[in-house]
C-alpha cells in the first residue's frame, strides 16, 4: 500500500528503444520498485512516435503493456517539439519550462495541454533562481488546473517552505501579481 500512495516519475535520455529498456531496468532497480508512474523521454530533438526509426515510443508502449510504466510523458525545451507532442495525442504529460515570466506561447502550451487532458509539469518554476519569491511562483502555477510545478529544492528549509504551501496555499493577490 505504501507504493500506491507515492507517485514516481523519472526520465530517460535514451536515443533507441534498446537504450530505453536498459534505462528503465536500471531505474526500477535503483528506485526499488516494480513500476514507474510517469516515464518521460528527456529533451529529445524530435517527437518520438510509434514506428519511427528510434524505436523509443514502441519500447515505452511495450513497457506500459508489461506494467512497468503507467504513463508516457516527454520533457522538452523546444517549443516545436512540445507542440508536436501535444498535437500527437501520444503523451499523457509534457514537462516544459514555465513560471510567472511565461510568454504568450508558453501559456498557449498550457491551454493546449488542458484541452487534450494532458498534464503539464512546470520545470524551472523559479526560473533557475531568477525568481526569488516562492509564494508568487506557487500562486502563479496554482491558477492553472493542469499545471504541476516541480521545485528545484536544494535545502531542507526550501522543502519546508514548499510543503507549507500545501496546507496554506498562497493566492494570487494584487500584491503578489505586482511582483
Language-model features and meaning:
Residues 15-108, 114-121:
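Glycine/proline-rich, positively charged
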Residues 10, 46, 72, 148-149:
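Short, flexible active-site loop motifs that bind/organize anionic cofactors or intermediates
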